[in-house]
């Protein structure tokens, strides 16, 4: 048998069989912990840990994969938070965990999207949906981490790769504010860096609000729209409506790395 499912595990009898299976899938991205492949027939993403690819012959399973625990990987599988895509299955070779499976979202990473052309109203509605999901995960005691480049968008947000999330005994309200600020920071990077830094630095109110963890990014975007509309003397529904106020100087080494082309 080439592969079989055992409970919540998809088990392959050898590393060779898993490698052959992956060749039938579509590579869709790499991260610090592993590589992802899409199975278009099942609409699933297979994330395979880096150790799998680093071994040319056989795997020192006990040494390399001992850190991976099924309960740990699937600890959020039953939490219903629509903006989050959690692991729902594990992948094993001879019973040793080498990756996990999650559902696929037909969306792009934020850093692959041109922020000038998206509808700000749709963006705000999508942010509100994330806030609702963040309330759910915060009530479960989950502390988010490493959201950069792990947020997808296509009229709504999908947050992926929760490998480094953890349970925390912080008060729910404080935890929500912490998690919300983590998400907000990525939206600030996406919308502002290398595009509107100069405009914001010249406006006292926006400068005060920008990146302030006590002010949510939803409120900031509404204020930004108002200020931009005032400057260009017309409603601003997307940032390209205010092209002439964009940065005059190109940012040489932006912190937020975009992949637009």
Question: Language model features by range: what are they?
Answer:
Residues 113-152, 157:
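Conserved kinase catalytic-core helix
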Residues 21-90, 113-114:
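ATP-binding glycine-rich loop module of kinase domains
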Residues 80-127:
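Conserved structural core of kinase catalytic domains
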Residues 154-261:
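C-lobe/activation-segment region of protein kinase-like
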Residues 44, 83, 100, 158-161, ...:
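Protein kinase-like catalytic core scaffold
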Residues 1-26, 64-68:
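Juxta-kinase regulatory segment immediately upstream of eukaryotic protein kinase catalytic domains
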Residues 41, 96-98, 155:
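Conserved catalytic motifs of the protein kinase core domain
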Residues 53, 109, 167-169:
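Conserved protein kinase catalytic core
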């Amino acid at each position: 048998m080439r592969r079989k499912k055992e409970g919540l595990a998809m088990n392959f009898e050898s590393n060779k069989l898993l490698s052959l299976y992956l060749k039938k899938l579509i590579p869709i991205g790499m991260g610090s912990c592993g590589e992802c492949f899409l199975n278009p027939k099942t609409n699933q993403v297979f994330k395979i840990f880096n150790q799998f690819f680093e071994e040319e012959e056989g795997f020192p399973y006990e040494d390399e994969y001992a850190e991976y625990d099924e309960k740990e990987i699937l600890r959020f599988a039953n939490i219903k938070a629509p903006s989050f895509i959690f692991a729902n299955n594990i992948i094993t070779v001879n019973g040793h965990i080498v990756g996990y499976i999650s559902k696929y979202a037909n969306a792009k990473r934020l850093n692959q999207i041109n922020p000038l052309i998206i509808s700000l109203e749709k963006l705000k509605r999508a942010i509100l949906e994330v806030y609702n999901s963040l309330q759910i995960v915060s009530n479960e005691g989950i502390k988010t981490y490493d959201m950069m480049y792990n947020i997808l968008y296509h009229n709504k947000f999908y947050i992926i790769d929760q490998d480094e999330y953890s349970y925390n005994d912080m008060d729910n309200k404080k935890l929500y504010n912490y998690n919300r600020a983590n998400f907000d920071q990525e939206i600030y990077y996406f919308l502002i860096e290398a595009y509107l830094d100069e405009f914001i630095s010249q406006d006292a109110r926006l400068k005060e609000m920008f990146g302030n963890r006590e002010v949510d990014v939803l409120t900031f975007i509404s204020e930004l729209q108002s200020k931009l509309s005032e400057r260009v003397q017309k409603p601003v529904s997307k940032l390209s409506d205010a092209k002439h106020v964009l940065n005059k100087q190109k940012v040489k080494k932006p912190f937020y790395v975009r992949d637009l082309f």
